[in-house]
C-alpha cells in the first residue's frame, strides 16, 4: 500500500512513486513464473497506488477487472472524503483461466417479490424469507473488515477478512489447487485455503504474524466455517440473524437425516 506504517516490530516508510514502481515490478516479475497458465492473480491496493499497480500488472499479466471493495470502516478526514474503499486488481496468466461464477453468488433479500402466474420470478421462497441469488459485480459492498468481536480478528493492522479471500479463492481456483500469498500477514489466505480444501503457501517476514497464522490454522480444524458464507452462497452484510437461522436448520436437517439413516441401517441388520 506504500504507507508509512508499523507492522509489529517492523516499520515501513512510504516510498517515492518511482521507487514503489520498481518495487512492484520486482515482486510481480518474481511471481510470474510461479503461476500456472490457467492461474489468476489478485492484488490489493488503495486509491493512491491503484494506478501504479494496474499499469505494472498489465506488463506481466492480462488485466481482467478492477474490483472496488467497500470496507465500511475508514478514518475520517477534516479536509477530504473518508477513505473507505480499496481496489483489488484481477488478472490472469493467459486467456484460459478458471472462473467459477456459480461458486460466488450473493444471496440477497427480495424487498418487492414479483410473481408470474402466482409463482416467484427469479427468486426463492423459503422459511427464512424471500431471497434471490445474484451474480456478483466488481463492486463488493457485502464484506467488512474483521472487527474485534469476530473470531478471526487479530491485531494485524491491515488484516483481510476470511469472507473476502473466500470469494477470490472460490472464483479463481478449484479444490486441490495450490494458492500462494507472498504477503501472508496474519495468515488469512492460508486459513481460508485450508477451509476450502486448497493447498497453500504463505510468505511472511514478521515472526509474530507467523505464530498467529499457525494458531489460526490449528483453530480452522475445529471451526471450518467462514462468516458470511453458508451453504455454498455469500450473504449480504448485516444478515447474521438470517445466516444463523439457515445454519441451524441445516444442522437439524443433517441430524435428522443421520438419525433416519441409522434407523434404516439397524433395520437392515435384523
State what each model feature region is:
Residues 214-255:
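S-adenosyl-L-methionine
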Amino acid at each position: 500500500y506504500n504507507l508509512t506504517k508499523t507492522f509489529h516490530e517492523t516499520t515501513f516508510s512510504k516510498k517515492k512513486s518511482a521507487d514503489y514502481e520498481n518495487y512492484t515490478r520486482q515482486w510481480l516479475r518474481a511471481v510470474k513464473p510461479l503461476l500456472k497458465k490457467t492461474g489468476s492473480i489478485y492484488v490489493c491496493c488503495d486509491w493512491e497506488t491503484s494506478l501504479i499497480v494496474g499499469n505494472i500488472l498489465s506488463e506481466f499479466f492480462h488485466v481482467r477487472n478492477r474490483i472496488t471493495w467497500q470496507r465500511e470502516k475508514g478514518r475520517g478526514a477534516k479536509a477530504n472524503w473518508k477513505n473507505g474503499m480499496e481496489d483489488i486488481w484481477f488478472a490472469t496468466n493467459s486467456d484460459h483461466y478458471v472462473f467459477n461464477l456459480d461458486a460466488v453468488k450473493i444471496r440477497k433479500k427480495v424487498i418487492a417479490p414479483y410473481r408470474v402466474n402466482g409463482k416467484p420470478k427469479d427468486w426463492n421462497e423459503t422459511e427464512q424469507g424471500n431471497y434471490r441469488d445474484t451474480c456478483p459485480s466488481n463492486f463488493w459492498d457485502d464484506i467488512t473488515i474483521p472487527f474485534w468481536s469476530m473470531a478471526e480478528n487479530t491485531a494485524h493492522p491491515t488484516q483481510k477478512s476470511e469472507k473476502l479471500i473466500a470469494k477470490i479463492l472460490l472464483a479463481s481456483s478449484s479444490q486441490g489447487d495450490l494458492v500462494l500469498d507472498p504477503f501472508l500477514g496474519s495468515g488469512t489466505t492460508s486459513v481460508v485455503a485450508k477451509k476450502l480444501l486448497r493447498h497453500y503457501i504463505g510468505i511472511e517476514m514478521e515472526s509474530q504474524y507467523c505464530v498467529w497464522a499457525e494458531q489460526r490454522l490449528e483453530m480452522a480444524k475445529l471451526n471450518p466455517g467462514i462468516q458470511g458464507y453458508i451453504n455454498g452462497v455469500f450473504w449480504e452484510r448485516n444478515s447474521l440473524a438470517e445466516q444463523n437461522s439457515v445454519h441451524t436448520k441445516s444442522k437439524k436437517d443433517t441430524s435428522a437425516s443421520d438419525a433416519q439413516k441409522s434407523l434404516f441401517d439397524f433395520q437392515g441388520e435384523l
